[in-house]
Amino acid sequence: MDKKYGICHLCGKYAELTFEHVPPKSANNKKRAKLLTGREIFDTKKLREGKSLKYINQQQGAGNYTLCQECNNNTGDWYAKEYIKFANEIGYLLTNKIDINSAKGIWLDTNKLYFQRIIKQILCMFLSTIQPGYAMEFKDIREYVLNKNSTEFNNKKYRISMYLLKNYEISHSGILGLLLKDNGETKIKEVAIMNLYPIGFILEIDPSEKNIYDTTDITKFTTLKYDELQNVVMTFTITEKYSLHNFTDRFIKENSNRSDNNGK
């Protein structure tokens, strides 16, 4: 196979790129994958003409050549193993502890996971799925991920939300600019979405005070130390609202012109 060279989405250096599995291979990503990207789902001409969406068949699992060897090795050693434990625990709960057809969510109670490592793996995957030019703009996120001991994360500029998927889906949107109406004013909201069965994530840039419907804000874990175990008791919603299969305008409708919980 020909070597692939380009800009590493994490360190920013021009180097030979290695294949970054998104999600990690042992997190339900070992077999051939059918990947749906944001570029395809927002092909308005195709949608108007009623044409079928085109999937990318990936023989070695979902992912792409986005990280240099050093960054791939480091993040794999530092973060991926903990994310795999987390994703597999969620998968076990969904398939063995609830009725997936009737349950609306799960309750997670654990003190055995290093959530800072999980968060940094999530951010590394976002960087790998974001368009190369955009990835370089997130220098603060890249520096946070590159330093395993860093606890400095700008939670005013970014919010990371999580939800659970009922059906199998591997898809990612890249950075989307959505036109939303807020109190009569039209604003552009930038988000990135990853559906990595059994978990989905949304990264918001310059988030509003309102959380996204049916998601759990996990940004607070960014301030944990690398070796810090955290007792986590949280509820995660099972939803298909942010599936890229049916995304279109639902996100816009449900997250525009909403009141905060206090009615303001």
What are these regions (language model features)?
Residues 17, 63, 117, 186-189, ...:
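Short, well-structured alpha-helical interface segments that form or flank functional binding sites
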Residues 32, 38, 71, 75, ...:
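Generic structural signal of hydrophobic/aromatic residues within well-ordered alpha-helices
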Residues 131-264:
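C-terminal, charged low-complexity interaction regions
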Residues 43-44, 92-95, 227-229:
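Glycine-rich loops and low-complexity Gly/Arg-rich segments
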Residues 33-36, 47-48, 92-96, 100, ...:
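Short alpha-helical interface elements
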Residues 2, 52-133:
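Catalytic cores of phosphodiester-bond-cleaving enzymes
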Residues 1-77:
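An N-terminal structural lobe/cap that precedes and organizes the functional/catalytic core
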Residues 43-49, 53-54, 97-100, 176-183:
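Low-complexity, polar-biased intrinsically disordered regions enriched in Pro/Ser/Thr/Gly
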